[in-house]
Amino acid sequence: MTTRTGPQYYPGADHVSYWYEDDFDATAMEVNVACLHTTEGRTVPNYVDSQGRKGASAPNLTAIPDFASRRLRWYQHFRIDSSARALANRYGGVETNTLNVVQAELVGTCDPATHAKWVKAGYQHIYWPEAPDWAKRDLADFLAWLHEEHGVPLSGPSRWPAYPSSYANGAGQRMSATTWPAFKGVCGHMHVPENDHGDPGAIDFPELLALARAALNLPKPTNPPAAAIPAFPGRKHFALGQSNNYVTQLGKQLVKRGYGKYYSVGPGPRWTESDRRAVAAFQRAQTWTGAGADGYPGPETWRRLFS
């Protein structure tokens, strides 16, 4: 297979100060996926592992905000078509870092708790779900360049849940071991199998794609209308002893969203403790607690589950 056919250095990026490809083996690829991370810090990390090796968990590039200039400054660690090291890759599982993916870490946070702490401390930073326009513009320019020079599609997952519900597969957003190898486009760390991290959180992905397409003067894509959310049938259908099609419908959607582990068999029409536990897990993933996570679906649980 032909590899490394496009330009290997992002224009304007510093590929000297934090260059790690000379220190680690890297697989030659032909990228068709871009994966976005957040560093959860305010400086460029050294990406040190437990053995003290700098760059051992580095992506291909890191973007740090320059608040004075209102721009992102880019540091490159590996060539574009070289495998980086920022994704977990379990023994015997699917390929992650080496599966034609270029990775970019965005300095800042996607965690609302960290954001609140830094605001209180007066630390200048980017909370990526609410990134300033200039940061979104520069990130979109990077995606546009990847599309134009490497053919990375300007498309990706529809679900970018907020952290911490995005951690592990709390919001059912993570790709499976079978869907990931076929994926092409832009995704987040939260979407890659064998990984637990929930970054980059609820970034405005549609806006990023729109900005990238505008930078290339591409027409707006025509999207099929979203499927209508089925009407909530009422709480009475989800109680001990109830048996109806709505319970089956609920259970199938829970499995689709990643909560199948709560079912030893099924799901089926009879309301069981398995259904309640699966619903409760989904509710907790919305950061609800107490009565809001009791395992019995109400209108808002239903709406979010089927969104």
Regions picked out by a protein language model, each given a short descriptive name:
Residues 2-154, 176:
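Active-site-adjacent loop/helix surface patches within enzyme catalytic domains
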Residues 100, 105-110, 188, 192, ...:
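Glycine-rich, acidic and aromatic/proline-enriched surface loops and short helix-turn segments
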Residues 273-288:
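SH3/SH3-like beta-barrel superfamily modules
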